[in-house]
């Protein structure tokens, strides 16, 4: 028996749950709320809420406070769960603080989001100070507009609709701002990608995963200093590598596995999806196979000769590294095991 994580849709095996020190009912409630992530050794990591969810909390609370003082709200998230946060809101002015989480590099933890609301004949959402402005094309928000991505903007709108219906008004004009947004933005890549003057309001799920998906930027130094390191190939690989190897440093290597292996001084594991890991080990694995993709090959012939040979070549190329291949649900398809 396993539980399905409602945020990333991965399976949480019962054996992982059994290893945890948290009582079963309490742990299951935490998992199903989206806030807790269980690792393979039973340890727990805590998710936080995105900038999008925090902005949503502030916006809804500001509208509700037009009628009465508010100290707690529930808002929708893009994955269908409700987010619950404390907030201070009175007379159309709300302050929500972005929750702490176990993502060590989340520089927006503890940041205050401010929303101001006035009654109106329709719903409008505007961005104030501290929210960046898009200065070039190619991003999810249009050039010249505030850097509020479509998913969180929809999330904010849905929450404000809930609020105006709850207090019985026709609409509200809501302005969202971050007093320290411009300051924090200097620590991000926003300036390089074309967002100026503040941070971006982001979040495809509404939740912040408790691991870093940009560790590859730290390159060789991080790997060299790690006693145990997992090299992985993408964001899905990061998720499952963190769960499967809780006492390892997880590094996003992408297509640079070979380069990063040379920097490692301790134990090394390579973990990721078959189309990335196996093709690193055997770039020609699809040649004369009759398959267009590795995913197709895995689905049709999971124990086939081409898969077996590619895994053997990957293990050989790994030079003693443990090779773990997972599918998109986190199921381990192949594992070379601990190397002596």
Curated annotation (Swiss-Prot):
Q: Does the keyword Transferase apply?
A: yes
Give the EC number: 2.1.1.195
Entry-linked InterPro entries: CbiD, CbiD_sf
Keyword vocabulary terms for this entry: Cobalamin biosynthesis, Methyltransferase, S-adenosyl-L-methionine, Transferase
- Mention one GO biological process in which this protein takes part, according to its record: methylation
User: What domain of life does the UniProt record list for this protein's source?
Assistant: Archaea
SUPFAM superfamilies, per the entry: CbiD-like
Q: Which reaction does it catalyse?
A: Co-precorrin-5B + S-adenosyl-L-methionine = Co-precorrin-6A + S-adenosyl-L-homocysteine
Molecular function as annotated in GO: cobalt-precorrin-5B C1-methyltransferase activity
Q: In which pathway does it act?
A: Cofactor biosynthesis; adenosylcobalamin biosynthesis; cob(II)yrinate a,c-diamide from sirohydrochlorin (anaerobic route): step 6/10
Q: Does the keyword S-adenosyl-L-methionine apply?
A: yes
Broad enzyme group: transferase
- NCBIfam families xrefs: PRK00075.2-4, PRK00075.2-5
Q: Which family does it belong to?
A: Belongs to the CbiD family.
Q: What HAMAP family does this protein map onto?
A: CbiD (MF_00787)
Protein name from the UniProt record: Cobalt-precorrin-5B C(1)-methyltransferase
Gene name of the encoded protein: cbiD
